[in-house]
Amino acid sequence: HDRWRSRVRGLPEFGGELPVAAMAEEIDTPGEGQVRALVTSAGNPVLSTPNGRRLDAALRELEFMVSVDIYKNETTRHAHLILPPKTGLEVPHYDLIFHTLAVRNTARFADPLFAGHPDGRTDAEIFRGLTQRMRRRSTKHRQQNIVKRTQQAALLALSPTQQLDVALRRGPAGGWGGRLLRRDGLSVAALRKAPHGVDLGPLEPALPERLY
C-alpha cells in the first residue's frame, strides 16, 4: 500500500493498482507521465466507473486505444482496434472463482466444445501478441538481464492450459507437490479422465503457510 501515488491527485496505490476514479484525470491532464494509450479487456468503464462522462471525453483524446472485447460498447467505441477473442464453448475452462467459494476441495477442467473460426485467437494469444510487440519497442525490457528475459519468454511460450497443468502438478494434490514424484497426482490429463470433476476432500487450513 502507498508504494507510489497517482500523478494528478497523489492517490495511493493499493496492491499495485490505483482507484479507477483517477483514470479520466490521468488521461486528460497534460504533463509528464500523462496516459496517452490504453488497453481494455472485457470492460466498459465509461458506464461502470465514477464520472463516466469525463472518462468518455478523455478516451477521445488518446493517441491509441485497443480493446480486447467481443462487444462494441460505450468504451470500446473509442478504440482504434477492437480484437474479439474466442469465447464461451470455443475455449478451455477451469474455474478459478467458484473453487475458492466451495465448501470442499474440488477441481474440474473442460476442453473446448467447438473449434471456433480458424482465424480466431484466445484472450491469451491476443495478449501474448500485444506483449511481444510492446516489448520490442521497450528500452526497459531490453535492459533487463538475460535470466529475467528468458523466464518471461518461457512463460509466454506456455498456453493457459500448460500453465494450469504446471500449477496443478506443483500444488498440494499434484504429482510434484510432495517430496516424491507421484504418477497419480492432479494434472490436466487426470482431470480430462474425470469430465465431471474430482472431489479432493474437505477444505484444509492453508492461511499460515500463505502468509509465512
Question: Where are the language model's segments positioned?
Answer:
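Long, low-complexity segments enriched in small/aliphatic residues
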Residues: 1-12, 153-212
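Non-catalytic alpha/beta scaffold blocks inside enzyme catalytic domains
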Residues: 1-168
